[in-house]
UniProtKB/Swiss-Prot annotation:
Mode of membrane association: Lipid-anchor
GO biological process terms held by the UniProt record: bacterial-type flagellum-dependent cell motility
Protein name, UniProt field: Flagellar L-ring protein
Signal peptide start-end: 1-15
Lipidation (N-palmitoyl cysteine): C16
Function according to Swiss-Prot or TrEMBL: Assembles around the rod to form the L-ring and probably protects the motor/basal body from shearing forces during rotation.
Lipidation sites (S-diacylglycerol cysteine): C16
Protein's cellular compartments: Cell outer membrane; Bacterial flagellum basal body
InterPro entries (alphabetical): Flag_Lring
Self-association and partners: The basal body constitutes a major portion of the flagellar organelle and consists of four rings (L,P,S, and M) mounted on a central rod.
Protein keywords: Bacterial flagellum, Cell outer membrane, Lipoprotein, Membrane, Palmitate, Signal
Pfam families named in the record: FlgH (PF02107)
Lineage of producing organism: Bacteria, Pseudomonadati, Pseudomonadota, Gammaproteobacteria, Alteromonadales
GO MF, any single term: cytoskeletal motor activity
Amino acid sequence: MARYLLLASTLLLAACSSTPKKPIADDPFYAPVYPEAPPTKIAATGSIYQDSQAASLYSDIRAHKVGDIITIVLKEATQAKKSAGNQIKKGSDMTLDPIYAGGSNVSLGGIPLDLRYKDSMNTKRESDADQSNSLDGSISANIMQVLNNGNLVVRGEKWISINNGDEFIRVTGIVRSQDIKPDNTIDSTRMANARIQYSGTGTFAEAQKVGWLSQFFMSDWWPF
C-alpha cells in the first residue's frame, strides 16, 4: 500500500511542477515606462506663439526615446510539414533433410525425421504532420531601453475582457530605429528576438486545456 501511495505522490508532484504560471494583467515586466522630464520653462513674452513649444514641419516624430510609443503590426505566418516512413523486411528459411543412420532413414512412428522452418517479417510505418499558424493585428508598445548601437528594446501588452474570460497579446523584442516607418509603425517581422504571445484566461481557456490524467498518458512518464 505504501508503494502505491509513494507512486501517486510522485505523479501529483510531477503534475504540479509542470503546471505553467498563469498570466496576470498587471505584470510588472510589461509595465510602461514613464520618463521623468524636467518641466519646460515658458518665458512670458505676451505672444500667442511660443518658440519653446514649437515643432518643425520637417522634424522626425518617430519613436526613439525611452517611454515613446510605437505600433507593432503583427504579420506572422508559419507553416511546417514533416513526413517520415520506414520499412523493415526480414526472412529466414531453414531445411534439415531426413536423418540417415545405418543406411536407412531415422523415423519416429513411421514418419521420417526432418525439419523445415520458415519465418518472415514485414514492418512498415508512415507518419505525416502538417501545421500552420497565422496572426494578424496590431499592438502599441513602449520603448523600454535604447541600446548603445541605437537599437530599441520594445515591450507591451493588450488585454481584452470578453464575457467570462480575458484575451491578451504580449510582445517584446528589439527593433532598429531605421526600420520604423514614418507613421510610427513597424512590422513584427522586422523585430529581433521577438516574443509574441496570444492566449487567454478564464472559462473558455480552461476548457481547451488537457486534463492532468491525459497529460500523464502523453508524457515521458508513460512507459508504453
